[in-house]
Amino acid sequence: MAFDPLLCRPILHSLPSAFKVNLRTARSGHWLENSILHLVDEAGSGQAGSKAVLAKLSEVLFVDTLRRYIAKLPDREVGWLAGARDPIVGKSLTLLHSRAEHPWTMAELAKEVGLSRSALLERFSRYLSEPPMTYLIRLRLQLAARALTATGRGVVEIASDVGYESEAAFNRAFKREFGLPPARYRRKQRTEGNNS
């Protein structure tokens, strides 16, 4: 599972510091217990391919545990995971993440999820503590930051790819979010990456 600290930040902030899974009461406790035992055996085996097995099995266990955690969240819980579970906010998040470059408006997003603008604004903000368009701006900038560090594409192209029509507007928004203009951010990230 690819881990991008910038894009995963909202999810990570919604997680508890530890998960507790009761194997005796979990519906698939037997499967979980056997998987954990296999993980422990695999870690000590030193066999060819054991790193790949450990990575994939850990990923499956994490996703399964995360699903259980989300399913048991109280109805009044807030945060990214609780929002993702809500049918309206979850659909909004899916739309924004799958088409971040789209020139979304509150009216269009509200129409897509079947609510009025004010109802969507209230519901989205209740779960995520910010309005959908603010969330979208941050998402676009995080996607741009990832592209700046992972590719050699130009700033103008990246700005366009994440939904900015104006390079100047992109540069201002990026600097406001990350404290540096995009080109300097790229150089800094690459320099820090080379020093690690």
Question: Can you say where each PLM-predicted feature lies in the sequence?
Answer:
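A generic short-segment signal for beta-strand/edge and adjacent turn/coil regions
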Residues: 29-32, 60, 154, 160
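Terminal helix-turn-helix DNA-binding modules in bacterial transcription factors
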Residues: 91-98, 103-110, 115-116, 122-171, ...
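Short, Lys/Arg-enriched, Trp-marked, Pro/Gly-tolerant hinge/linker segments that flank
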Residues: 19-27, 43-58, 62-102, 107-113, ...
